[in-house]
């Protein structure tokens, strides 16, 4: 099977989430890319509103993408876990919290980016910085880059 271009895959995942009216924001390396970094990733990390009805919408969207494992998960299990990983080589990681960041904070402040005609709610620079305060070296490097982007944007 031919590997899809990452932007196409990201747009496809988010298109399905949008069609199901899932409440989510893009976080992680994919969000950093949309803000202008060159961080490589194959994963799509989403921070969701951790309610059972919303988890159902998210799982339904991923199942429609052919991610069969999404059909086997119970929405209440997803809501109880901090992260659920769906996929193998290129995962969709469903977060109910990204370090100490919650959807209740990040959702209303999300910035919409458009990728291949799909609107993608993306965590703000401030919220991405907050989500990266983990103590990991890669996250510390990401914070430096995000702070520089914030400085350049004024």
Give residue ranges: language-model regions.
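Compositionally biased terminal segments of proteins
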Residues: 1-154
